[in-house]
Amino acid sequence: MRELILLRHAHADAAPLEGNDSDRSLSARGRAEASLAAARLLARGLVPDLALFSPAARTRETAELLRTALGLPLQAFRELAPLYLATPAVLRAQIATIDAATHRLMIIGHNPGLSELAEELDPKLRHTVLVNAGYVHVSIGGAGWRGLSEA
């Protein structure tokens, strides 16, 4: 049995009129949200073997705050360009590449893709909309990570 944690990035500052969405940094509120998410993950024993995150500043910063709070090494966190504003199909394709030795995987990314994937993976999560720094925890049976690309 594999476990997947889908975590939306924490709250970010608004983009400047001429700025890029991907350059938005976490707000003070977002930094507090990320710390609270880390505490909740720790309290539930949900420490990932591996975490993948999008290259957007807000997801990188969320990932770094989580990594530090969870006491995980740098190599346990990887940036993946395709995760930026990824659709459920792209998320599934990326997850399917994960080595079978990884039992608990975390994806730190964006809505609507994360919330839509959560709905696809677990009917109980229908109409779920992840809030900033919110997460869902899903058990993955069957063929493991590779099986997600076939669903």
Residues covered by each model-derived region:
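Short, solvent-exposed coil/turn elements at secondary-structure transition points
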Residues: A10, L83-L85, V136, G141
